[in-house]
């Protein structure tokens, strides 16, 4: 029995990797991560005999976040002294190689995903009807369509090269296909810094939003170009890419207000701006955060931009709807559905006036 098997298994699980047993043959192993559909977790483990005779597991592991492999070294819990100087040097070299192997594997995976996405995009229909878009009250800007009626959003870089796709389905279509309503395809795509631009080349102002429906709403309401970042975690990287591509253009991040969350401990609903740390139901740290606001703030800081949130007329009712029924009203598409495009336009223009941003 490997002396630190249970300890290493615990370290990987604590990092979020879903693993039942450990492969210690020194090869790259991919695995799923808690609360995530994709296999973004990885590890490379080896066996090494210590001076005292015990065989220990050594190596590294991590969770992919964009282009960052998140590499961490297996902690040996004060047993490093049991290795010779030569063993420690060999281990250091092996860990460095593991990180390079992880990076190389990720680049190859992303390249395969980009090729598959580009091929699928070329075969998709130029025109179509989308139940998803109809349910959101928005048009399809630069989209293509699947034979089953799904809307397809390209995920591209500043040169227009496609790196992945987002497939949008109505709830009915998702249930029939046994797939999610929003699906990133294919597995392994590189999202970081990639986006979908609506409305042509920005001249002086560019809006940035998370989801397609939100971005489409903003474009329909204002006529301004809008970029889709797809997730809150991608906002900063997309903002950097856009600022580099369109120098001198102001970037306004139109954030999702993810104030309604669930406690990680008891799964009860709460409002994170009213309970900053502990859950009001179980008293434990809820470990929840307003990802939309945090992501938008980070993006604005990166590019000297600004942020804004949708302002609902009856915000108390919006909050109560989440706490009592789990109904989330978070973005400008929700505002569009409840109060109309004219309200969205008025709020954006008011924010631009407040910032003293105007066309030259």
Regions inferred by a protein language model and the residue ranges of each:
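A short, sequence-level motif marking secondary-structure junctions
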Residues: 78-81, 169-172, 315
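Phosphate-handling DNA/RNA-contact segment within nucleic-acid enzymes
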Residues: 109-112, 150-247
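Non-catalytic accessory segments of DNA primases and related replication-initiation nucleases
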Residues: 1-132, 258, 265, 269-271
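Short aromatic/hydrophobic-glycine micro-motifs
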Residues: 14-17, 138, 305-306
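Short, basic/aromatic recognition patches
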Residues: 131-148
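TOPRIM fold recognition
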Residues: 1-6, 204, 220-360
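Acidic surface patches and DE-rich sequence motifs
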Residues: 67, 146, 157
């Amino acid at each position: 029995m490997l002396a630190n098997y249970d300890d290493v298994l615990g370290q990987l699980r604590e990092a979020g990797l879903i693993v039942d047993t450990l492969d210690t043959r020194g090869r790259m192993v991919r695995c799923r991560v808690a609360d995530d559909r994709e296999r973004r977790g990885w590890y490379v483990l080896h066996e090494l005999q210590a001076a005292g005779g015990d065989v220990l597991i050594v190596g590294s592991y991590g969770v992919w976040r964009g282009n960052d492999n998140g590499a961490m070294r297996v902690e040996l819990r004060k047993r490093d002294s049991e290795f010779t100087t030569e063993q420690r040097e060999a281990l250091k070299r092996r860990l460095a190689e593991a990180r390079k192997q992880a990076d190389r594997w990720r680049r190859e995976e992303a390249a395969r995903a980009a090729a598959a996405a580009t091929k699928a995009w070329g075969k998709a229909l130029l025109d179509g009807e989308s139940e998803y878009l109809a349910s959101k009250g928005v048009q399809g800007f630069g989209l293509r369509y699947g034979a089953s009626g799904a809307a397809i959003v390209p995920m591209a870089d500043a040169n227009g090269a496609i790196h992945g796709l987002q497939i949008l389905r109505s709830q009915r279509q998702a249930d029939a296909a046994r797939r999610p309503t929003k699906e990133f395809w294919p597995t392994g795509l590189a999202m970081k810094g990639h986006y979908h631009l609506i409305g042509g080349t920005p001249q002086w102002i560019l809006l940035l939003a998370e989801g397609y429906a939100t971005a489409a709403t903003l474009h329909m309401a204002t006529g301004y170009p809008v970029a889709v970042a797809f997730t809150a975690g991608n906002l900063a990287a997309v903002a950097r890419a856009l600022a580099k591509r369109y120098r001198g253009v102001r970037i306004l991040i139109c954030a999702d207000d993810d104030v309604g969350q669930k406690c990680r401990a008891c799964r009860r609903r709460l409002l994170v701006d009213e309970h900053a740390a502990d859950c009001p139901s179980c008293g434990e740290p809820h470990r929840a955060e307003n990802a939309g606001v945090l992501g938008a703030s980070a993006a604005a800081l990166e590019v000297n931009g600004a942020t804004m949130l949708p302002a609902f007329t009856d915000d108390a009712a919006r909050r109560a709807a989440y706490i009592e029924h789990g109904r989330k009203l978070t973005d400008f598409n929700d505002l569009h559905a409840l109060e109309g495009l004219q309200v969205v336009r008025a709020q954006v223009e008011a924010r631009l006036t407040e910032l003293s941003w105007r066309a030259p």
